[in-house]
Regions:
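Major-groove DNA-recognition helix of helix-turn-helix-type DNA-binding domains
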Residues: 15-42
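Basic Lys/Arg-rich amphipathic helical interaction modules
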Residues: 1-16, 20, 24, 46-79
Length: 79
């Protein structure tokens, strides 16, 4: 059985970003998390992380739809 909550380092591994980036996402409210224990360690619920990833997929698809690739963009990427 998978753990319900993930440490920020685990979230960073899933998202392929640094732990400090995940911490910033949590502190800014972008990624929902809870603070537990006497030392106040952050935990992200696995289902919330999956919802966050789905939200980012949706936002990215919408951005791509609103910002289609142009020939100029394609030429710049080739450089």
């Amino acid at each position: 059985m998978e753990a319900r909550f993930l440490q920020l380092s685990d979230v960073a591994e899933v998202l392929n970003v640094s732990a400090s980036q995940v911490y910033h996402m949590v502190r800014s409210g972008e990624l929902p998390a809870i603070k537990i224990g006497g030392r106040g360690q952050w935990r992200v619920e696995r289902t919330r992380l999956e919802a966050y990833i789905e939200q980012k997929h949706t936002e990215t698809a919408q951005w791509i739809k609103e910002n289609p690739l142009t020939l100029r963009d394609d030429a710049e990427d080739a450089i």
